[in-house]
């Protein structure tokens, strides 16, 4: 066996490369919430933003913070841990903050190293309102609606005016409340609400979100009938094909908003502006209106198992006539003890006579209406109305399916229904096609929850890795590799950042030092836990430790190298003079 006079062999460096792998430039991405989402604050001015997203390479933890968009518009937070040791490519968790308008920033860690960041601009903690009632709440185009000047005043960007769908709205989108904005799902302009939003944002230094479910021409009876599942009739279209309101309407939009947007973002109050049609032409009496109004308030609470606050405008003016009975009925509901119903503006004296049909506000009347609403939202209102806070986002788990070529995404127990965007109605979904998957969950009352989004990329089963020698990159290693017993063999994994390397020793690492004889293989494992097949093995043969030769003088001008006979070595030697190798491998020189 050949020996070196200068010492034993050093370690041999091998490298591992993958045949192919998915590579993504972005390490982490926020998928919820969307820009301009506003989360309802509590009485102590705080709230929780439930954040979720995807990551695309192994990470140890995710942190988030809120940074004010503009000086004076909030209190920036310190970094908060959203989740430790996230699994399956999805992270989720709460971020706590105070009233303000923020950038939501997240960062991903491996160990102490930041390996990825993302940001969502314009996310708020403030006030959320659902508008409902009839035309003076719904609004119109071309009557002088003024948009909000403050960038922090927002509305839901969803139009259900024509379709009158009873299905859940699409994933929430928002827009700044400009003059012509359609305040989803049914508002027809900024109406007075843009100005009201400006007033609230300025006075309380907070963002505002409006959702509008009002329906022109509706009576209090229409709202009660549709809440009971009965067909509501449009009194202005009797005998025409449009006599019946669409199925479930007008109540459908209101209860969907309470179950959907309120669950996700919370709610300060329902703003009710209605009563004109119950005056003219119906001439409804005090008790009937009061009973119906209280029934409607109670029904929204029974249908959600929550206790939303209401603010009732006192409104009855229609074509020059007012109704003390309607006004008193509205006041009766407001005055009911422990009802969480508060007084809104008395609108009958505003802009008399009114333009056009002498019922709808317009021009400066909309400014007056907004001011009247604002005047009722004083400090007492904000401390006495009981807000509903956003509900936690359901947890989600992702694992590799048994066949190794699909991913199983599982939603938590405790919900009454599960519905995937791809159409399935199951609690767990096995996915073999790349895409973004999200589910809608409902509790027994129909309150809606959105799961975190899961992004599945190809290949679901990673490619099989190969092992190559460092001195021969790109060439798969073949045959046995040898080291001496006092040395180690170091295997280095060269793989894309979204892949983990799992050795047959159980080690999960990119470099592996081994000194025991045997066969070594490696598997590629992705974020979902799906593994490739085992690589071709590298067989390690371990030779006994080389004995340091003893050099002695054999003659006047010769040297001799010897090792103990029992060592089994001594056939060949490498001789050197200084750093120069000599062309002699004999025992003497």
Show which residues each predicted segment covers.
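Bacterial Sec-dependent N-terminal signal peptides
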Residues: 1-27
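Cell-envelope and extracellular/periplasmic
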Residues: 26-391
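Acidic, contiguous N-terminal accessory segments
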Residues: 15, 42-44, 470, 482
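Proline- and Ser/Thr-rich low-complexity, intrinsically disordered segments
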Residues: 375, 379-589
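N-terminal hydrophobic or amphipathic segments with adjacent small-residue motifs
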Residues: 4-5, 19, 127, 269, ...
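Short intrinsically disordered, low-complexity coil segments enriched in acidic
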Residues: 1-2, 49, 199, 506, ...
């Amino acid at each position: 066996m050949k020996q070196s006079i200068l010492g034993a062999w050093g370690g041999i460096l091998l490298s591992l490369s993958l045949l192919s792998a998915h590579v993504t430039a972005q390490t982490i991405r926020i998928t919820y919430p969307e820009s301009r989402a506003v989360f309802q604050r509590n009485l102590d001015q705080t709230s929780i933003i439930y954040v979720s997203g995807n990551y695309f390479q192994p990470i140890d933890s995710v942190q988030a913070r809120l940074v004010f968009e503009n000086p004076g518009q909030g209190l920036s937070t310190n970094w908060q841990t959203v989740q430790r040791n996230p699994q399956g490519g999805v992270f989720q968790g709460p971020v706590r903050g105070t009233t303000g308008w923020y950038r939501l920033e997240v960062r991903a860690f491996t160990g102490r190293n930041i390996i990825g960041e993302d940001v969502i601009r314009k996310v708020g903690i403030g006030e959320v309102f659902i508008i409902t009632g009839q035309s003076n709440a719904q609004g119109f185009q071309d009557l002088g609606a003024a948009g909000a000047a403050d960038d922090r005043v927002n509305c839901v960007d969803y139009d259900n005016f024509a379709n009158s769908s009873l299905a859940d709205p699409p994933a929430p989108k928002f827009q700044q409340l400009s003059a012509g904005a359609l305040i989803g799902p049914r508002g027809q302009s900024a109406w007075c609400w843009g100005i009201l939003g400006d007033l609230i944002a300025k006075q309380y230094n907070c963002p505002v979100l409006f959702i509008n479910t009002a329906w022109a021409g509706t009576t209090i009876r229409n709202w009660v009938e549709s809440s009971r599942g009965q067909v509501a009739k449009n009194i202005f279209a009797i005998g025409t094909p449009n006599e019946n309101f669409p199925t479930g309407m007008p109540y459908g939009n209101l209860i969907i908003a309470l179950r959907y947007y309120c669950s996700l973002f919370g709610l300060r109050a329902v703003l009710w502006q209605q009563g004109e049609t119950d005056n003219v032409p119906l001439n409804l009496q005090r008790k009937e209106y009061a009973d119906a109004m209280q029934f409607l308030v109670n029904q929204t609470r029974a249908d959600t198992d929550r206790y939303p606050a209401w603010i009732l405008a006192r409104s009855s003016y229609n074509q020059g006539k007012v109704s003390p009975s309607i006004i008193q009925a509205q006041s009766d509901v407001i005055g009911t003890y422990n009802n969480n119903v508060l007084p809104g503006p008395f609108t009958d004296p505003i802009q008399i006579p009114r333009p056009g049909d002498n019922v709808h506000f317009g021009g400066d009347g909309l400014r007056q209406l907004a001011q009247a609403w604002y005047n009722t939202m004083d400090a007492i209102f904000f401390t006495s109305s009981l807000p509903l806070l956003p509900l936690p986002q359901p947890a989600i788990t992702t694992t590799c399916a048994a066949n190794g070529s699909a991913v199983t995404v599982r939603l938590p127990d405790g919900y009454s229904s599960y519905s995937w965007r791809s159409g399935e109605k199951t609690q767990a979904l096995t996915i073999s096609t790349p895409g973004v998957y999200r589910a809608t969950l409902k509790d027994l009352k129909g309150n809606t929850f959105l799961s975190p989004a899961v992004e599945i990329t190809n290949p679901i089963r990673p490619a099989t890795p190969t092992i190559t020698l460092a001195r021969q990159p790109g060439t798969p290693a073949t045959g046995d590799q040898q080291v001496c017993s006092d040395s180690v063999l170091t295997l280095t994994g060269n793989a894309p950042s979204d892949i983990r390397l799992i050795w047959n020793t159980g080690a999960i690492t990119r470099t592996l030092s081994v000194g025991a004889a045997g066969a070594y293989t490696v598997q590629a494992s992705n974020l979902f836990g799906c593994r490739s097949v085992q690589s071709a093995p590298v067989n390690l043969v371990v030779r006994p430790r080389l004995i340091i030769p003893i050099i002695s003088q054999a003659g006047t001008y010769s040297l001799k190298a010897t090792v103990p006979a029992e060592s089994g070595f001594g056939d060949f030697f490498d001789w050197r003079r200084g750093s120069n190798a000599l062309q002699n491998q004999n025992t003497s020189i």
